[in-house]
């Protein structure tokens, strides 16, 4: 398993962070908090229902910064952004909680989820079952598993932990080898294809198109990164890809929800507002 240098650095710090979190709050307490959290909102179902109707199933991201681009949004109020996305037609939210590299916070996820009715994925680098239980404790409805950061045994363990606490799983791949591992190891219906090359950081929508034939029809493909204009959306929809994870394009807009509506709905002749019921 070849892990890109930037990702290695993030994962090394993440291992330290998890140890620090465990020292502050033990697993038994996190499990107690997870049991008392609001019921999951059905992240996978929200996407699957939209895709079934051939409507855009948009996971709208709340992200303050990134390692490569720095701060993306100075005026950063997660609750405000969440409400804007919900009004703009998002199916789900993605909230960055990584502190050191993305200037995220658990509090951002809590604030965003409390401000709307949308299901939320905790976007972070998951390497320990503790983080999965913690995700449920802070209110997440889904977690992300990045294949390039995990071996198959750990990936399966994390997915099993997610299932045990009622969380959906979005598995993220970057190439055919990772896709093969993901399909062999996990039964989650959500397969995210990141169009960004982790080694070169170049973005190409061809990554999604190239991998599509290898993905069983009972899995929902979520294309991630590189959706910047209406032509990009239509390219995916022609190939029957209806689920999208978009962050940077929205974060740089004055009104993120309005930008979402413009990109995915305005030129379709109809605007879908709000979240689908679970």
UniProtKB/Swiss-Prot annotation:
It catalyses: 1-(2-carboxyphenylamino)-1-deoxy-D-ribulose 5-phosphate + H(+) = (1S,2R)-1-C-(indol-3-yl)glycerol 3-phosphate + CO2 + H2O. The gene is trpC. The keyword Amino-acid biosynthesis applies. The keyword Lyase applies. HAMAP family: IGPS_B. InterPro entries: Aldolase_TIM (IPR013785), Indole-3-glycerol_P_synth (IPR045186), Indole-3-glycerol_P_synth_dom (IPR013798), Indole-3-GlycerolPSynthase_CS (IPR001468), RibuloseP-bd_barrel (IPR011060). Pathway: Amino-acid biosynthesis; L-tryptophan biosynthesis; L-tryptophan from chorismate: step 4/5. Belongs to the TrpC family. Its EC number is 4.1.1.48. One of its GO terms (biological process) is L-tryptophan biosynthetic process. Keywords: Amino-acid biosynthesis, Aromatic amino acid biosynthesis, Decarboxylase, Lyase, Tryptophan biosynthesis. GO terms for molecular function: indole-3-glycerol-phosphate synthase activity; phosphoribosylanthranilate isomerase activity. This is Indole-3-glycerol phosphate synthase.
């Amino acid at each position: 398993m070849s892990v890109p240098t930037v990702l290695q650095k993030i994962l090394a710090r993440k291992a330290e962070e998890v140890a620090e979190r465990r020292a502050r709050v033990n697993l038994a307490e996190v499990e107690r908090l997870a049991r008392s959290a609001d019921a999951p909102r059905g992240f996978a179902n929200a996407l699957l229902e939209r895709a079934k109707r051939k409507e855009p199933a948009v996971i709208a991201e709340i992200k303050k910064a990134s390692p490569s681009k720095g701060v993306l949004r100075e005026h950063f109020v997660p609750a405000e952004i969440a409400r804007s996305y919900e009004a703009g037609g998002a199916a789900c939210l993605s909230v960055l909680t990584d502190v050191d590299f993305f200037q995220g916070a658990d509090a951002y996820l809590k604030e965003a989820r409390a401000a709307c009715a949308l299901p939320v994925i905790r976007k972070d680098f998951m390497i320990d079952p503790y983080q999965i239980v913690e995700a449920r404790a802070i209110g997440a409805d889904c977690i992300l598993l990045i294949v390039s950061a995990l071996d198959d045994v750990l990936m399966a363990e994390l997915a099993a932990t997610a299932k045990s606490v009622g969380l959906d799983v979005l598995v993220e791949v970057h190439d055919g080898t990772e896709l093969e591992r993901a399909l062999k190891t996990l039964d989650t219906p959500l397969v995210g294809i990141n169009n960004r090359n982790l080694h070169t950081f170049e973005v190409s929508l061809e990554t999604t198109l190239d991998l599509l034939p290898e993905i069983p029809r009972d899995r929902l493909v979520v294309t991630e990164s590189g959706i910047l204009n209406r032509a990009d959306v239509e390219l995916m929809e022609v190939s029957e890809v209806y689920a999208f994870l978009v962050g940077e394009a929205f974060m740089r807009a004055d009104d993120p929800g309005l930008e979402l509506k413009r990109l995915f709905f305005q030129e379709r002749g109809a605007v879908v507002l709000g979240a689908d019921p679970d």
